[in-house]
């Protein structure tokens, strides 16, 4: 399973959205309906799955699906 597929599966699981809604340009808040608690849980899941730590400052910059994919690629 590719990194993108793993990220997509986590987003589908945590936000309860359809897989076809999770495209790279999708905004977590505007397109996928996430609230601040959802975003915290999403970041925690990414940290656990990919064994990395995302600072609060960095997490605030992760607004779209592509942002989290690019962050993980750069830090793993």
UniProtKB/Swiss-Prot annotation:
| Keyword hit for Cytoplasm | yes
Q: Which GO terms describe its biological process?
A: lipid A biosynthetic process
Q: Which gene encodes it?
A: acpP
Under HAMAP family, the record lists: Acyl_carrier
Domain Carrier positions: 1-76
InterPro entries from the entry?
ACP, ACP-like_sf, PP-bd_ACP, Ppantetheine_attach_site
Main site of residence?
cytoplasm
Check the record and name the NCBIfam families matching this protein: acyl_carrier, PRK00982.1-2, PRK00982.1-3, PRK00982.1-4, PRK00982.1-5
Q: Which residues cross the membrane?
A: none
Give the superkingdom in one word.
Bacteria
Its family?
Belongs to the acyl carrier protein (ACP) family.
Localized where?
Cytoplasm
Q: In which pathway does it act?
A: Lipid metabolism; fatty acid biosynthesis
What would be an example GO MF term here? acyl binding
What does the UniProt record tell us about how this protein is modified after translation? 4'-phosphopantetheine is transferred from CoA to a specific serine of apo-ACP by AcpS. This modification is essential for activity because fatty acids are bound in thioester linkage to the sulfhydryl of the prosthetic group.
Q: Which GO terms describe its cellular component?
A: cytosol; membrane
Q: Which residues carry this modification: O-(pantetheine 4'-phosphoryl)serine?
A: 36
Q: Which named protein is this?
A: Acyl carrier protein
Q: Which PROSITE patterns match?
A: CARRIER, PHOSPHOPANTETHEINE
Q: Which UniProt keywords apply?
A: Cytoplasm, Fatty acid biosynthesis, Fatty acid metabolism, Lipid biosynthesis, Lipid metabolism, Phosphopantetheine, Phosphoprotein
Record's function text: Carrier of the growing fatty acid chain in fatty acid biosynthesis.
């Amino acid at each position: 399973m590719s990194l993108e597929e793993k990220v997509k599966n986590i987003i589908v699981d945590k936000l309860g959205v359809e897989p076809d809604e999770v495209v790279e340009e999708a905004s977590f808040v505007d397109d996928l309906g996430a609230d601040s608690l959802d975003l915290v849980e999403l970041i925690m899941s990414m940290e656990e799955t990919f064994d990395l730590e995302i600072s609060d400052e960095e997490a605030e910059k992760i607004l779209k699906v592509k942002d989290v994919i690019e962050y993980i690629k750069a830090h793993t």
